[in-house]
Amino acid sequence: MTRPVVTRFAPSPTGFLHIGGGRTALFNWLYARKHGGTMLLRIEDTDRQRSTQEAIDAILDGLKWLGIDWDGDTVYQFARAARHREVAEQLLAAGKAYRCYATAEELTAMRDKARAEGRAKLYDGSWRDRDPSEAPAGVKPTIRLKAPLTGETVIEDQVQGRVAWQNENLDDLVLLRGDGTPTYMLAVVVDDHDMGVTHVIRGDDHLINAARQKQIYDAMEWELPVMAHIPLIHGPDGSKLSKRHGALGVDAYRAMGYLPAALRNYLVRLGWSHGDQEIFTTQEMIDAFDLPAIGRSAARFDFAKLESLNGHYIRQSDDHSLVTLLEDLLKYIPQGPAIATKFDDSIRAKLTQAMPGLKERAKTLIELLDNAGFIFADRPLALDPKAQAVLTPETRQLIGRLRAALEDVSPWTAATTEAAMRAFAEQAGLKLGAVAQPLRVALTGRTTSPGIFDVLAVLGRDECLSRLADQSA
């Protein structure tokens, strides 16, 4: 009988939720959801000096923002240290592990000698079969696994294929340190086994760990989970991903104005493919996702592609939901608190009214907010340099005449204001563009905006006439 699928995401809380970690979590989540299984969350907080509550909170918050939920309670690895020690003692009692009394100086000498001789195995196994009665006084022993000395350790990986290591090149790895704390290798195996994990989906930088962990599984006579080591994310030029390329926390993408659905869609296509399809609903991702469709080559991060995809999601979003997203964004950007004080029902209504025109022009929520700035700008408007260049003395006189032509328009709509401006332009012998641009500058402080008659309608009669008065001669 096939066991139900259980995946896990197991980040170390030493910083933010990295974009690569977000993709790993997404792949685990998709695979579990596709197979009607569960995805567990384990915080690998055994590095007590580097693990922080702030980082844990950032990871949990990042996952929730991405729309990735997990099943059951969060497991904290450090809290399970007694269980990890118990397994090490079991292996010791079964003769599958041993106490190593090598001093730090001896270990350094062994490593230096091995490197000088070009040997991969750095520990010489000197305490493997040595009588513990020969132990030197005052040395706290580690517990090491008695790894096989001959043959090979093989992982049949769902992404990488068959990967083999010669056992003669693998050390007897440390299970418990001299102070009694378990090592990462032991803790991961024990936790995955006890949590019932059936599939380990993680970055291919963990591939060598898989060989060492399999030796622990074999020693304990536990079933090895299915392994899938996914390619890392590189920069557009193929080099290691840096902050310049996009090696940022998920929280940074939120602050840059990316929609969680867009980032999810982009991440799923980094290393995984499904024909030529680029845009997926969440359900389509779940239905289509599978491990064999993940490539072995490093995926290349492309900001332009992410922006384009984000723009698509913005255009497809409901106007009301975009207003909510904009308001939520304010918590994460420097200028947010000042703008948040202006958000009231009137501003929300104006944003919703303007959104059809605004969202066609924006690739991120930051751009969307910037383009909507005219709605909550304070009078007199701050003019950008291009707008200032438009406002010559002659233009200011024209704005005064435009204001007079608009003063009696009723009702105040995009259609009625457009009719008034067309009539004014015709009467003055001007092209409509010669009228529209001064209006745009006076009403928005910029030379680009949504359709000028939409701007007039959104701002309303009183605000428009006041802004025109501010800029007229």
Swiss-Prot record:
Which reaction equation describes what this protein catalyses?
tRNA(Glu) + L-glutamate + ATP = L-glutamyl-tRNA(Glu) + AMP + diphosphate
Sequence motif 'KMSKS' region, location on chain? 240-244
Q: Where is the motif named 'HIGH' region mapped on this chain?
A: 11-21
According to its UniProt record, where is this protein located? Cytoplasm
| First-tier enzyme category under EC | ligase
According to its UniProt entry, the function of this protein is described as: Catalyzes the attachment of glutamate to tRNA(Glu) in a two-step reaction: glutamate is first activated by ATP to form Glu-AMP and then transferred to the acceptor end of tRNA(Glu).
Record note on quaternary structure: Monomer.
Family of the protein in this entry: Belongs to the class-I aminoacyl-tRNA synthetase family. Glutamate--tRNA ligase type 1 subfamily.
NCBIfam families with a match to the protein in the record: gltX_bact (TIGR00464)
Tell me the protein's name: Glutamate--tRNA ligase
Q: Which species does the entry assign this protein to?
A: Rhodopseudomonas palustris (strain ATCC BAA-98 / CGA009)
Q: Its gene?
A: gltX
